[in-house]
Amino acid sequence: NLINFMEMIRYTIP
């Protein structure tokens, strides 16, 4: 899903 991908990136840039 789109949200899933965005969420992953958000966690990758803490």
From Swiss-Prot:
Its EC number is 3.1.1.4. The keyword Lipid metabolism applies. GO terms for biological process: lipid catabolic process. It is found in: Secreted. Expressed by the venom gland. The keyword DNA-binding does not apply. It comes from the Eukaryota. GO terms for cellular component: extracellular region. Its cofactor is Ca(2+). GO terms for molecular function: phospholipase A2 activity; toxin activity. Binds 1 Ca(2+) ion. Belongs to the phospholipase A2 family. Group I subfamily. Heterodimer; disulfide-linked. The A chains have phospholipase A2 activity and the B chains show homology with the basic protease inhibitors. This is Basic phospholipase A2 T2 A chain. The lineage of its organism: Eukaryota, Metazoa, Chordata, Craniata, Vertebrata.
